[in-house]
Every structure is written in structure tokens, then in C-alpha cells.
Amino acid sequence: MSGWPRIYYKLLNLPLSILVKSKSIPAEPAQELGLDTSRPIMYVLPYNSKADLLTLRAQCLAHDLPDPLEPLEIDGALLPRYVFIHGGPRVFTYYTPKEESVKLFHDYLDLHRGNPALDVQMVPVSVMFGRAPGREKGEVNPPLRMLNGVQKFFAISWLGRDSFVRFSPSVSLRRMADEHGTDKIIAQKLARVARMHFARQRLAAVGPRLPARQDLFNKLLASKAIARAVEDEARSKKISHEKAQQNAIALMEEIAANFSYEMIRLTDRILGFTWNRLYQGINVHNAERVRQLAHDGHEIVYVPCHRSHMDYLLLSYVLYHQGLVPPHIAAGINLNFWPAGPIFRRLGAFFIRRTFKGNKLYSTVFREYLGELFSRGYSVEYFVEGGRSRTGRLLDPKTGTLSMTIQAMLRGGTRPITLVPIYIGYEHVMEVGTYAKELRGATKEKESLPQMLRGLSKLRNLGQGYVNFGEPMPLMTYLNQHVPEWRESIDPIEAIRPAWLTPTVNSIAADLMVRINNAGAANAMNLCCTALLASRQRSLTREQLTEQLDCYLDLMRNVPYSTDSTVPAASAGELIDHALQMNKFEAEKDTIGDIIILPREQAVLMTYYRNNIAHMLIMPSLMAAIITQHRRISRDALQQHVEALYPMLKAELFLRWEREELASVIDALASEMQRQGLITLQDNELHINPAHSRTLQLLAAGARETLQRYAITFWLLSANPSINRSTLEKESRTVAQRLSVLHGINAPEFFDKAVFSSLVLTLRDEGYISDTGDAEPAETMKIYQMLADLITSDVRLTIESATQGE
């Protein structure tokens, strides 16, 4: 490049370097998209904009990608490294004419015809300044937004720091030439496909236009379902039709979001400033699969686990910075207080009551509103657990909103709905102290401005945050496989509840919970908490803690829980150093070395973080517990023990394996434990290795409290086979509370009502107990004897004496 173009670009780059601060999506394009910089690369942009080209150039140079302004020389031919699909307002006449893109594509393809070794990588790139979707009134949504010079100047001046450069996966021109030819018609098709690609990408980043709120309400009021519900309201409450309609409008006002792009931009600035000071990093994994879904036109429903009120903001922030539209979020009505409520509403929150029972008008309005969001193409987010987990484990799913999602499909919408499970993890949850109090019986404090300010005042170093996108679940595919006749239930007016709906929703919900756990994230805090809580005195020397973390890390890396789970790349020593900076542990020095201590007052709180990854370590912990107690055990006997206890573990922790997969899982874990030197294998028997017995015992402790809890329930069931389910739950909790006091068990979930309720339901499903309360004494006693061998004698005596004393 020489002469006037060089001078022009240098002059144009001066204001851009000041006004524009763009972000690359993905963060590492060459690595994440598999670009080979040793092979020729050319860039395709949607429309002629030198500002876009220079913004792209800055990102290319920052990520060691070829400079788009440097032409490509191929077989003596000199070609521009960039192609504009659309023409546009130009300053100099020699710039790309309208059909130049087709000519350049043809030139590139023609070079491949004469050179079989040539393979140019064509990389589509979108550069966006601002992402306001606009309102529905007036103009139609343009497929591509071309701005003239004046408009572009103002866009860059106002939105230059809210810009991103989106790199798409490359297209091999060699493959295009081999499979489709190199003539001009193929070049025209390539330009047309690129144009469609950019239009879809813009829609994925900006979203559909927003309706005027009153227009949305008018449309909802005109729906037959709400009109019928209004008539029923007037008749049942003996009020006028106008009054019933006002009630419906009041409910819409209570529920509906009031999305504002300017509020999103402002909040993004505030959160960007806040995150950088509170978090040491936010780790995002598998976002590309969601970007692809959005690009392919899917209606996306984000289904994250719920750890903290921070989840709402963190996920929207992450999605925004991944080039996606922040979703409309179903938030509890308890958050609709001033000033949080109006702010959340403008950030996309729509509010939902805890229960719909007894209010047909409310349930109809909410269902129609949710259906309208889907039909308009807005992404939606809701927490299938229904509330924040107080224990750090996933809660049993609440299926109401999920059921309404499937009912929205039964209205005959054309866009495919896909559920995206998301694991959110933290190294510090600001509400964890409150959770512990609530589990001990304290009344939940109502959300309010003073409570919010108190919470914000306590925010300090929050460590790392984790957002892992799990395996998406296309609802249409799921229904086609499991309910082939589902289309017979489509009704565009009525909310249909076919016989298959409830069992299918329950099955989908359980599958979602498994997929959320599949995307679990191990980190310094939850690994250190797991190890220290496994120690009887909540303390280990630094060498012991390092050895234990190495054990956990090797298990998770060499026998991964799932392909979607993540394990830190740092060493055990680096993780310990990071965890100590969080000020949750104490380090004492003696003449021999460092001792890492988990203070008593912190122990209860730290169980929350341990529980975040309990599912990722429960299988090796269970195997270690069985081997430790038996000292030596055959491979077959080990499998029998695991298979007997697995149904309870699977239901409680939403584990991923089916029963027939257990044999291979046990083999893989046993091989890894043997490699680590924790056990030895002799004549198909697994033996403890005395040299590493402490590490094995600490690993086994991860299953200790779970096995004790199961022992309580199975002993009660054995002692009284005719006990009914509610009494079994109640008495199990009573014994668990006594056990926690007498044996210093600091885990609040040890006697959590929900845990025992889930356990008793699983016992019913597995045939240990019937709905009438009749148990099979021989079977329950057999399992109890197995469990009794895996717990200490003093705990066993406490369990048995507690029931005898009654």
C-alpha cells in the first residue's frame, strides 16, 4: 500500500485510535477458530467502511493475524486481503465498486483452479458499533445496517467504546473450488451466502426490535386466551368487564420487562468497572456453541443454576461481551423493590410470583407474555431451581416455567426453541453467611434497599467467576425422540396440557440438571475447602494439602467428570497461594513448615463451596471409602457396592452416568487411583497402599457424610418397615441433627429437609418403600449392613441408640 491510500488510512486512524476501544469475539480468534497463520488468510466484511477495516486491523495486529491492509501475493497476482460484500458511501472513487466483491471472490477461486496446493482461508468478520435494536414502530429491521459518513462519525464518537469485532469460523476456498467449481456463478453464490451470514449475525448480536410497551399490552389483551380469562375474572369476582380488564393490565405492568439498550450500556460500564475491582477474572467456556445457535436462528432459553443474586448481572454481562443479546430474565417478585425493580426491568427482567395457584388470570397473563417473548424471538433466561441454592448443591427443579415453555411450542411457533444449561461458579458468594443462618432455622430476610446496600458494602475480593455453557437441548429434537405424537397437541389458542406433558417436563428438567452439573467448574476455593473439610481437625500441612489437591486434579484431568467440565490449569501450589489470598483460611508457621487451617467459624460457610463440586468427586470418594473400610476388596464386590448405592447418589447429585456405564467408570477411576499409588491391584483385588493411606482417607471423606445420612434412613426403615414417608423424613432429620451435634458435623445440608425428601422419594422409586409405607425389611437391612461397614463404629452406635431410645 502506498501513496494516497496510506496517507488516508493514517489520517483516519488518528481519531479512531482515541475513540474506539473494541473487543475481539472470540477472545483468541486464531486459537479458538483454528486459523492457520502459515496459510493465506483473507477477510470478508459486510459493507464498505474504512473505519470498520481499521478497527479490524487493530484487532488483527493485537492477535498476530495478518494485516488486512497488506495485499496477498499468490502466483504473481496481487489481491486485496479484504473484501466488502456491499458497497457504500465512499470518499475516493477508486474504492470497491458495487460488484467488486463478486469479482474478487472469482479471482480468488480462479487461482485455486490453477494451483492445487493453494488453500486460502476466508474469514467473515463483523465490526459493530453499538447494538441498539430500535423500536418496532416505523422502519423494518434492515438485514445490514449501512451508515453514511456522517452517521458513522456520530456512531463511532458515541459508541466507539461499545464495539466489537466478531471473527467467524473460516471457510476453505480450496474446498469451495473442489466441491462447487470456480466460475462466476459460484462467486455470486458465495457473496450471497456471506450477505445472509452477516444479516443473521447482526440479528444474533442486536436481537429483534423492541415493541412499545402499550402496543405489547394491547396485543396481549386482544389474545383469545386473555380475553376469556378476563371474562372469567369478571364473572367469578362479580365485577365489571372494564374492572377485570384493568386487573389484567395491572398484572402485565407487574410482570413485563421494559428493556432499554441505554440502560444496558450504562450498566455494562458500571459492571465492567466493578468486576475488574472485585473479580480477578471471569472464566467463560463453550460460548461458541451458543453463538452458533443464535446465528442459526434458534429461540434460546438460558437455564443456569442459581447461586446468588449476582447471577442475573453476571450472565447478562458475559452474554453481552460474547456478542449476544442479553436475555429477558424471569426474576422473583421479591426483587421488585425500589430502586432495584425498575433497574432490573430495564435490563430485561420480567417478574414472576412464587406461586400461580388460585389465580387463573395471573397464570394466563404470564403464560401469554412468555409465549409472546418466544414468538417475537427474544432470548429468555430462567432459573429452573426456582430459587438460590442455600447448600451449594443443585436444588430439585421447579417445572412451572419449563412447562409453559413447552406449551409455547404447542402454539405452533416456527422458531426452534433450544434450552442451554449453564453452570455458574464463584470463589466467593456474598450471601453464603445468610444461607447458613437460614439452614439453621433463621427467617429469610425480605429483599430491600437497606439489605442490598449492606450486601454491597461487604463486597471485597471475590476471586474468580466461572460461566460454563453446557450441552444445549433442542426441544423439538427431544420431543421428536420421546413424544413422537407431540404435534397432535398443537393449538394456537388454548394452553394445552396433554397427558404426556407432566412426565416429559419432569424428564427434561432432570436432564437439564444433569447437563448443568456436567459443566461444573473446579477452582482453587472449592478444591481447598474439599480437602480441609475432609480433615478431622480442618487443618493440613502445606505438603499434605498440596498432595491432596494433586490427587483431586489428576483424577479430574485424567478421568474427566464430563467433556464440558473444567479443571484449573494451575498447579496445586499455585491454587493454594490463590486460595490463601481470599482470606478464608489461616496459615501458621512452625519449625517444620506451614499449616493451613480452616477456622471453626468459617467451616460451616466453606461447605457451600465444597458442595459446588461434590458431584465431580463423589464417585472416586465412594470407591475410596469402600476400599478404605474393607482394606482389600474384589473388583466385583466393589462394583456391587457402588451399584447398590448409586441410585440414591444419582438422584441427590444429578450424576450423569446410567447404571450400565458404571463398570467402565469404576475401571477408569481404579486405574487412575492405582497410577497415583493410592491402591494396588493384586489378583483382581484392590488393596490399600499404606504409603498413601492418608491421601486415600481424605479422598474417602468426601463421601463420609452422605453415607452417614443414608445409614440413618435405612436404619429407621429397617427398624420400622411400616413407617410412612413423611415420618421417615422427619425422624431422619431428627437423628441427623443429633448426629451433627454429637460428632461435630459442620455441614448444614446434613439435615436439610430437601435432601431427605429427595432421598425418600428415591427409595420409593427404587422399591425400598411403597406409597403406603410398607418396606421390604430384608432388602433395607442388607443395604444398612453395607452402609454400617462404611461408617465409623461410634457413628453407627449413635444412629442405632437414637432410635432405640425412642
From Swiss-Prot:
<dbReference type="GO" id="GO:0004366">
    <property type="term" value="F:glycerol-3-phosphate O-acyltransferase activity"/>
</dbReference>
<keyword id="KW-0443">Lipid metabolism</keyword>
<dbReference type="InterPro" id="IPR041728">
    <property type="entry name" value="GPAT/DHAPAT_LPLAT"/>
</dbReference>
<keyword id="KW-0444">Lipid biosynthesis</keyword>
<keyword id="KW-1208">Phospholipid metabolism</keyword>
<dbReference type="GO" id="GO:0016024">
    <property type="term" value="P:CDP-diacylglycerol biosynthetic process"/>
</dbReference>
<dbReference type="Pfam" id="PF01553">
    <property type="entry name" value="Acyltransferase"/>
</dbReference>
<keyword id="KW-0472">Membrane</keyword>
<keyword id="KW-0997">Cell inner membrane</keyword>
<keyword id="KW-1003">Cell membrane</keyword>
<dbReference type="GO" id="GO:0006631">
    <property type="term" value="P:fatty acid metabolic process"/>
</dbReference>
<feature type="short sequence motif" description="HXXXXD motif">
    <location>
        <begin position="305"/>
        <end position="310"/>
    </location>
</feature>
<dbReference type="InterPro" id="IPR028354">
    <property type="entry name" value="GPAT_PlsB"/>
</dbReference>
<comment type="pathway">
    <text>Phospholipid metabolism; CDP-diacylglycerol biosynthesis; CDP-diacylglycerol from sn-glycerol 3-phosphate: step 1/3.</text>
</comment>
<dbReference type="Pfam" id="PF19277">
    <property type="entry name" value="GPAT_C"/>
</dbReference>
<protein>
    <recommendedName>
        <fullName>Glycerol-3-phosphate acyltransferase</fullName>
        <ecNumber>2.3.1.15</ecNumber>
    </recommendedName>
</protein>
<comment type="similarity">
    <text>Belongs to the GPAT/DAPAT family.</text>
</comment>
<dbReference type="InterPro" id="IPR045520">
    <property type="entry name" value="GPAT/DHAPAT_C"/>
</dbReference>
<dbReference type="InterPro" id="IPR002123">
    <property type="entry name" value="Plipid/glycerol_acylTrfase"/>
</dbReference>
<dbReference type="GO" id="GO:0005886">
    <property type="term" value="C:plasma membrane"/>
</dbReference>
<keyword id="KW-0012">Acyltransferase</keyword>
<keyword id="KW-0594">Phospholipid biosynthesis</keyword>
<dbReference type="InterPro" id="IPR022284">
    <property type="entry name" value="GPAT/DHAPAT"/>
</dbReference>
<keyword id="KW-0808">Transferase</keyword>
